[in-house]
Amino acid sequence: MNPFPGLRPFLFDDSHLFFGRDTQITELASRLRKNRFLAVVGTSGSGKSSLVRAGLLPELLSGTMASAGSSWESATMRPGGDPLTNLARSLVEAGLYDQDEPEIISQVRATLTRSGLGLLEAVRQSDKEKKSNLLLVVDQFEEIFRFRNSEDATDEQAAFFVNLLLEATAQSDLPIYIIITMRSDFLGDCSRFPRLADTVNEGEFLIPRLNRDQRKAAITGPVQVAGGQIADRLLSRLLNDIGDDPDQLPILQHALMRDGNRGIPRHGKMHRDRRGRRADLHRHAMIFHQKGDLLGQIGP
């Protein structure tokens, strides 16, 4: 088993491989108790999506928010080129409705567009257990700003989508929680929508850099889950090579995934000479830079 996902984010089913973020998970859950709208903000590849999907979601299902219980439904979406359809699709694919067919998605979309309370109405009409909470994750929220500037969009469409989210978390009748993940360089764009900047400011969670011990756990934890070990000398060199630069974390994850594809020795140790490891990291970094903003497009 290869315990490293590479460039893609950690998903819910990868939670047993997600290490080094315990403090952040606890803090995020604590903030969600006080604010139903959270904005997880950070640079490309800083682990925003992974923190929510593989960290927070399993934590919520464990009952960590006693006031909300442990019954949760979750839907994940990206705005893309049609935010309203993608929102409707995410609700249907999350199993909130007994049927999972194209016409159901169209019906849910129609409900969403009836009024500013469309998301509330869509949830009321769903087959979700009445006492269960709904967590909607809007990943790569910055896509809404690109959508607003596209030829196929209007200011009204983008603003309507944003307003649906804000209205859903401003009420207390239904237990709806929303988390957006967004690149930090788009924070200023939030002022383009009424109330969004203030709401983001109130619920902002800025992804901190991992310290050395946390980076160590992120490397050794998955290896140990896979039944292997990593040589102390190699571990020290890896930690020294990536340093405090968050841009190196996705590159390291990709390099470790490549090593994992070659096989992690059970009850043995991963070894690599310093020159070889540095060459690996440098080669992967060059590939990413040659492909442009790859990390910004698909990084975790």
Task: Kindly label every feature range from the protein language model.
Residues F288-G299:
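Hydrophobic, low-acid, alpha-helix-prone terminal segments
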